[in-house]
Curated annotation (Swiss-Prot):
Its main location: membrane. One of its GO terms (molecular function) is protein tag activity. This is Ubiquitin-like protein ATG12. One of its GO terms (biological process) is autophagosome maturation. It is found in: Preautophagosomal structure membrane. The gene is ATG12. It is a peripheral membrane protein. Residues 40-49 have a biased composition (Basic and acidic residues). There is a cross-link at G189 (Glycyl lysine isopeptide (Gly-Lys) (interchain with K-149 in ATG5)).
């Protein structure tokens, strides 16, 4: 038998007594049955409130609030090529305007080996500023033919693969180059 909480044990005993009394007794008037049903509902309500479960109306309210917050957030027109062109020209941009979207500028990355890892040739490479640092990791793994490569920006920290190369370059460039040191094992910390 599955162990029950104290209140459940008491309620199950009273429930079995109620069932046995109702089966052996004469039919009760509808008012008495309605009162006992009301009492049982109140008991269940108390037990549920002790569990502190969110009611369905609470979850519906939170869902509605989240949807209204999402709808209230405005999306800037600059995020869409179509909307930005429609705002400036008063209509949809032509296909020639769409093909003329400027490519992000390229940034220079200088690779410096740490320890006994070989030098990557060329030492300075250019990459699109919109690329993630994960692309740099893939490039180094292929060039060095290693399974794992640990990279450090300016010998100080290891960037995450999701970080943007352009942002790293803007913040940590030295002589207009992002200095990336690399090694086969963990070098710092």
């Amino acid at each position: 038998m599955v162990p029950l909480l104290e209140s459940e044990t008491e309620n199950s005993i009273s429930q079995s007594q109620f069932d046995s009394e109702s089966a052996s007794a004469e039919p009760t008037p509808p008012q008495h049955t309605q009162e006992s049903l009301q009492n049982r509902l109140e008991e269940y309500h108390e037990r549920l409130s002790r569990l502190q479960l969110p009611s369905s109306s609470d979850s519906e309210c939170s869902d509605i609030e989240q949807e209204s917050l999402e709808l209230e957030q405005e999306v800037p027109l600059s995020t869409s090529v179509y909307l930005a062109g429609a705002r400036s020209a008063g209509g949809l941009p032509s296909s020639s305007e769409l093909s003329e979207t400027p490519e992000p500028p390229k940034v220079a990355i200088r690779f410096q080996p740490i320890g006994s890892v070989g030098q990557v040739m060329p030492q300075v490479c250019r990459i699109s500023s919109a690329q993630s640092f994960g692309a740099v990791l893939v490039f180094l793994r292929r060039r060095l033919r290693l399974d794992t490569v640990h990279c450090y920006v300016s010998n100080s920290f290891a960037p995450t693969p999701q970080q943007n190369v352009g942002q790293l370059w803007e913040q940590f460039k030295v002589n207009d180059e992002l200095v990336v040191s690399y090694c086969a094992t963990v070098a710092f910390g």
